[in-house]
Each structure stands twice: as C-alpha cells, then as structure tokens.
Amino acid sequence: MDSVLSGKIVQILVGYLKENIYSEQMIKLRMKRICSYEEFLPTYSLIERITEESKEIAIKVYEKNIIVEIVKDFKNKDLIELFELKEELFDEALSYLKKYNADKFLESYTLYCFSEYSDPDSFIKENKSILTKLLRNQYEEVPEEYINELLKSKIKYSTKDLIILDWDNGIILDKNEDFWEEVDIIELACIRVLNLRVFDSMLSEAIQYFTRLQWEKLGYFKLKKLSKDLYLQRISYISYFDSIENVLMLYGDRYYAELYERLCKIFYVSEWIKRVEKKMEMISDIYTMTRQHLTEFYGLLLEGTIVALILLEIILALAKIV
C-alpha cells in the first residue's frame, strides 16, 4: 500500500493572451544565485495575488503569456487524494485563464514539494511507489525500469535538496521550502514551448491561406499587396521567433542551465524549433514565388505598354499622312 505524504503542491498553468494585459506592479524572477545578471532576466506584471488559508494564487503576465500559479499545503494525503487535489487546482487555474480571455493553447505543470525528510535520497527510496505514480500521473504500478531511469535523472544543487522532472509533473525536495527559483525556471520553460506551439499554429494557418489562393487570377495590384503582406509577416515571424528563443538568458549558474535544458529536452523543444524553422522556410519560398509572379506580371505589363506606345505612334503617323 502506498504511503501518505505532507508538503506543498504547486499547480502552474501558462496561457497565451488574445489581448495584452498591463499592470503597474512589476515583479522579478525569484533567483538569488545570479543577481549580478538581473538585468537580463524577464520581468512580470503582477495582475492578481490572492492569499487564502493554506493556499496562495499569483497571476502574472510576461509579454503575451499569462501564468497562473497556485500553491497549496497538504497534510497526510494518499495518492487518490493528491490526484483529486491536483484536478481541483487545475480547474481553478483554468478558470483564471478563461477570466482573462486566454487562447486555447496552454501548458500545465504540477510540482509536489517536500521539506520534511532527513536525507533526500532516502526519502525518494522510501516513497518511490507513490512518488513515481505522481510523476507518471497514474494509479497503476510503475515499471522498475522507469523508476531507475527517473532516479538517474535527478538534479541536485547540494546534498540536502533534490529535483526530479517528468513530462508534466515534478518532485522537489528542499528542507527550507526554498523552491521558488525552480518554479520560475519551470514556468519559463513552459512559456517557451507554449509560444513555439502557438507560433507553429500561426505559420500553419498562413501557409494554408497562401496555398488556397488562385494565383493565376490575381491581378498586379493584388499581387503587390500580397507581396507586401508576406514581407511584413516574415519580419513579424522572425521577431517573434527571436523573442521566444531569448525568453531566458542564463548566466553564470550551472544548476539553472542544467535544469532549464533538462526541461527543454522533456518538452521536445528542439523538435518544435525544427518544425517552426521548416515552416518559416516555406513562408520564405512563398514570398520568393510571389516576387517572381510580380516581376513576371510587371514584365508583361511593361511589354504591353511598349507595344501600345508603338501602335499609338504608328496611328498618329498614319493620321498625319491622311
């Protein structure tokens, strides 16, 4: 039978806003170990902070991303109770995304945080059955191979703490309950993969629109307008892609870099980047094709104008003879 656990659960939900939201209250990342590089780190707008008994809710905005972070204490909870609590917090976080009119795209991550233990490795081994089920989000027993793989992938800053990350769940052990730096890194990784997904969808819609066009029926002025629109879209896409890749600049701390890179690997960020780059190349090819169509159309128009002028000169000459 699985053991019961006490600690904190952190439910993170990241969405993409349809319209920008602004707040005068600004907050910075909770990272202490790289304070000398503070100017390079993102700054959030704090939209709401709600404090209740054993629960705190923070709603933040970074550019067009909205982050809902709910932290709740739990005491002597078994697996079923923890899953019920997770579902409850997810639904609550989702209600805030709907309140602020976020888009359909979202990223969710749940952290189970513990501080009552003597040794982090011993705590994991003693509770590995329930912990691995929490990580896999399943009631069934987890294969031993998966458990061993998870234990090998743990990240440690010191001998007193430990973090294990999976697809959409993670476990943090910190005696001082000072896990906010890790929460910030996870939120930024969620922002990165969410924005790549949004960008991928935007590019797909643009490509579908351009491939449905009946190019042979487009006149010169429509082609010219289309060429201009494509050019502006290319600039917009390149700028947006650059902002995604620069969402977090990690300087001077190996632990942060390892944590962030591990998350990017879990989220298949490199594969998303390849998808996006391929579609950006397709947009570039469409732009080149449009310019070629425009050049050919302009050439035909110029030839027609020259022929018309020659005919006009001939007609005028004949008129003088008559």
UniProtKB/Swiss-Prot annotation:
Membrane-spanning parts: 299-319
Membrane topology term: Single-pass membrane protein
Where it sits in the cell: the answer is:
Membrane
Keyword annotations for this protein?
Answer: Membrane, Transmembrane, Transmembrane helix
* Main location, first listed in the record: membrane
Q: Which GO terms describe its cellular component?
A: membrane
Protein name in UniProt: Uncharacterized protein MJ0711
Q: Which species is this record about? A: Methanocaldococcus jannaschii (strain ATCC 43067 / DSM 2661 / JAL-1 / JCM 10045 / NBRC 100440)
